[in-house]
Curated annotation (Swiss-Prot):
Gene that specifies this protein: KLHL36
Pathway(s) of this molecule: Protein modification; protein ubiquitination
GO BP annotation list: protein ubiquitination
Function noted in UniProt: Probable substrate-specific adapter of an E3 ubiquitin-protein ligase complex which mediates the ubiquitination and subsequent proteasomal degradation of target proteins.
Source species of the chain: Bos taurus (Bovine)
Record text on subunit structure and interactions: Interacts with CUL3.
PANTHER family given in the database record: KELCH-LIKE PROTEIN 36 (PTHR45632:SF4), LD33804P (PTHR45632)
Domain BACK residue range list: 148-250
UniProt name for this protein: Kelch-like protein 36
Swiss-Prot/TrEMBL keywords: Kelch repeat, Repeat, Ubl conjugation pathway
Pfam families per record: BACK, BTB, Kelch_1, Kelch_KLHDC2_KLHL20_DRC7
InterPro entries in UniProt: BACK, BTB-kelch_protein, BTB/POZ_dom, Kelch-typ_b-propeller, Kelch_1, SKP1/BTB/POZ_sf
Amino acid sequence: MMEGSRQTRVSRPYKISESSKVYRWAEHSGTVLQRLNEQRLRGLFCDVVLVADEQRLPAHRNLLAVCSDYFNSMFTLGMREAFQKEVELIGASYIGLKAVVDFLYGGELVLDGGNIDYVLETAHLLQIWTAVDFCCEYLEQEVSEDNYLYLQELASIYSLKRLDAFIDSFILSRFGTLSFTPAFLQNISMQKLCAYLGSSEVQRECEHDLLQAALQWLTQQPEREAHAYQVLENIHFPLIPKNDLLHRVKPAVCSLLPREANCEGFIEEAVRYHNSLAAQPVMQTKRTALRTTQECLLFVGGEVSERCLELSDDTCYLDAQSEQWVKETPLPARRSHHCVAVLGGFIFIAGGSFSRDNGGDAASNLLYRYDPRCKQWIKVASMNQRRVDFYLASIEDMLVAVGGRNENGALSSVETYSPKTDSWSYVAGLPRFTYGHAGTIYKDFVYISGGHDYQIGPYRKNLLCYDHRTDVWEERRPMSTARGWHSMCSLGDSIYSIGGSDDSLESMERFDVLGVEAYSPQCNQWTRVAPLLHANSESGVAVWEGRIYILGGYSWENTAFSKTVQVYDRDKDKWSEGTELPKAIAGVSACVCALKPRLEDKKKKGKGKRPQDHGQ
């Protein structure tokens, strides 16, 4: 090599891989921002000066445009400010501007009672939504019974959906107290009042309290009477006892509001509802509905394994928060191997056995109805035939009782119950005697599968479909596994046939079936899915919050009752164990229905709610 020449490449004594690797500077963005902030504080390389309240803040256009839609538009769309060395921000305070600019450079926003109004105003003006969101989070911590109306007005001025939703939750959880305060009655808007009165989350002792709050608001100012109909249509008058409607509510409404308000019609509607006791399930409107957003998983009745108890009259629901089974109003009579259906927000219990011998001799034809609004059971029209080990469907505005058995043996008859007439009528029967089968509803069609036709012999694989519009039963593709005393339910686009038992052809001994198969009505095809963890003959079944729940049951091989709850996750095709039942039980029914919330539950629910919406 010539003397004085530069070596341009190091000679490699060993070979180095030609594959590339990426190395990341983890602190890069933080370091860049820190150095930019240091330059800003020293006035280095700043190309714009922001002016507010005649005070100046140097900054870098590039960073402002990256962090703020407001500045991005100002500096890129040819506005005159793009060429000015100083930009005056009308409507921004220096206190707010300095806090926001410091936040853009340092990532930290200092908020306190002295600057929050200024910072919120400036952040909203400059469209720096992360800062606005932090302001909302700060204000949520400060909401109190003294300032909630001011903060609600602030949320309205700046269209702060997150803060507005939080204050709504704050008011709803304390409505019973706040709604009678002078500040609320004088300042709350008609739109907000209607939203609160129409909410399922509103805290109150009873519906009458909401009516009183509405009447107090309406009578505060004469011009509000024009809004009486809009306000009172949110009161669930049918939830008020009939005696109170006639002797307290009607006189109050008539004396406080002019006839032109047309509000007496709400009371008349509620009285008609109370007078039509049996028809109530098919008279449902928004005003007859319970004020709740959640449905509960329940089990009713059953045969328990403990001595001296035998049959149960328990009605229990699962408290999702405590994961405990809580007792609701018990059945009027002990029952097992009955059926349950929900219609119009009412729970119906039909048939079943009134003794531990459920062979059919103790079959019942009684129909009980539970109203969660008043937590009461009543007896309505009995079925034409006594039935045990049958299926009860709820479809449109009627119930359908399918097959079963009684003291005369297996049944093929099918009958429907009309709440409107409080009567049962026979419809097209099954093509064969059937009991110990299972059923479900899918898109207004009744499906039943399996079961026995006579006392002796193996169970069936058949699947039948009933169209109530044409009153016709049709055969569908049979299951791959014969079964009886099993469970059926519909979830998504599939019908599931779950567990049960069968009799051995050789020994005639009964054995447990753990297999589960899913049926596609569109394809008329069965597919095997994950099997059960435990035997489940004569168990309760319900679909709750997108999962299948199997409650209790009986194992023929182990001759044992079960208190296990098995839960199926369709997405994972996996069974797991849920909260155990209080007792080992079989011949139990399960359903999902909205229940009247306990007052303490509503108070718990109302506290600490923090909506996570975007803070705009």
